[in-house]
């Protein structure tokens, strides 16, 4: 069996809200693997994912990607990871192309051809406004953005929400095309 390198380490992650506590979450992830969280609504899956990428600040614990701490190397790490949190539900009045023109500026490795391929594959029109898209099409748009900058790790929250089976299969095929860890 191939000895794959560890690319994500979460140790004793804790986050408290008034009515919820995430306690001592720890795990590691090796390159080229797929990992999933299963749990009831409100169990802390989204809080864990958002804490991992520093969108929610954890109370205690550590998160390292590629051996670097997310809190001290956030910009560098975010060039190498990508995340999509369910459907795109912001900037409802904006056209996809407008959102993309801002989004892609954050990534040194943005691949316009890959992005256009995903738009075609997912049948997305860059001239449409977000509010004109179904839930499933919004998810596809979020995935098109997430998959278009050659990330090494793809972090998905509710990745199949509103997607048909063909689109679900496409996500898994994308993993093999880009050698992603999901």
Report the location of each language-model feature:
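Conserved beta-strand
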Residues: 10-13, 20-30, 37, 61
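Catalytic Walker B motif of ABC-type/P-loop ATPase nucleotide-binding domains
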Residues: 154-158, 163
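Walker A (P-loop) phosphate-binding loop of ABC-type ATPase nucleotide-binding domains
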Residues: 39-44
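ABC-family P-loop ATPase nucleotide-binding domains
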Residues: 79, 83-141
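A short, proline-enriched helix->beta-strand linker immediately N-terminal to the Walker B motif
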Residues: 148-152
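Helix-to-loop junction immediately C-terminal to a conserved catalytic motif
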Residues: 53
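Short hydrophobic beta-strand immediately N-terminal to the Walker A/P-loop
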Residues: 35-37, 49
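Conserved ABC transporter NBD signature motif
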Residues: 61-72, 76-77
């Amino acid at each position: 069996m191939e000895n794959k390198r560890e690319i994500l380490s979460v140790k004793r992650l804790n986050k408290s809200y008034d009515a919820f506590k995430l306690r001592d979450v720890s795990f590691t992830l090796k390159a080229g693997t797929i990992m999933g969280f299963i749990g009831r609504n409100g169990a802390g899956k989204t809080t864990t994912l958002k804490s991992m990428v520093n969108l929610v600040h954890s109370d205690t614990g550590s998160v390292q990607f590629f051996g670097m701490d997310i809190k001290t190397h956030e910009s560098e790490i975010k060039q190498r990871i990508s995340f999509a949190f369910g459907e795109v539900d912001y900037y409802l009045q904006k056209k996809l192309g407008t959102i993309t023109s801002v989004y892609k500026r954050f990534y040194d490795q943005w691949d316009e051809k890959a992005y256009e391929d995903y738009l075609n594959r997912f049948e997305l029109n860059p001239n449409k406004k977000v509010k004109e898209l179904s839930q499933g099409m919004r998810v596809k748009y979020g995935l098109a953005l997430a998959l278009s900058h050659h990330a090494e790790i793809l972090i998905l929250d509710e990745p199949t929400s509103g997607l048909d089976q063909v689109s679900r299969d496409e996500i898994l095929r994308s993993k093999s095309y880009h050698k992603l860890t999901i």
